[in-house]
Amino acid sequence: MAKQNKIGIFTYMLNNYGAVLQSFALQHYLQTNGAADVEIVNFETIRHQQLNKIFRKYSDNFLVQLCFIMLTLLRYKQLKQRKIKTLLFKRKYMKFTRVYTSQTDLFSNLPEKDVYVSGSDQVFNPNGLNRDVYYL
């Protein structure tokens, strides 16, 4: 890989260990194999923000939502610690572009890169969010 390459990574980033470590590993691999600048494209819509909340709407069904809230309360401390740890890790070890909050925002202000990479198992989830962004 030529040293002048600027690479943008499109990935489905949630505050869980798997998503963060997968993104970090890809970014680190590209950096240590010759890329001059590697950034994760920080695409975070309102729906992404909702999914990253500890308490969120899980279902329209009242009983299902109530069960979700109760289970979340039982695991609140663990979920809060995980969220803090992943945010601190991302700040310390990972490089991101500015935040893009919509497809329109992203497509009209696409970060200038030589190469774009799409990664993460969730990028190819047929039920995933904003698939057009990740399918390059």
Model-derived segments and their meaning:
Residues 1-6:
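Extreme N-terminus of proteins, especially the signal/transit-peptide cleavage junction
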Residues 7-17, 21-22, 26-136:
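Aromatic- and Gly/Pro-rich donor/ligand-binding loops
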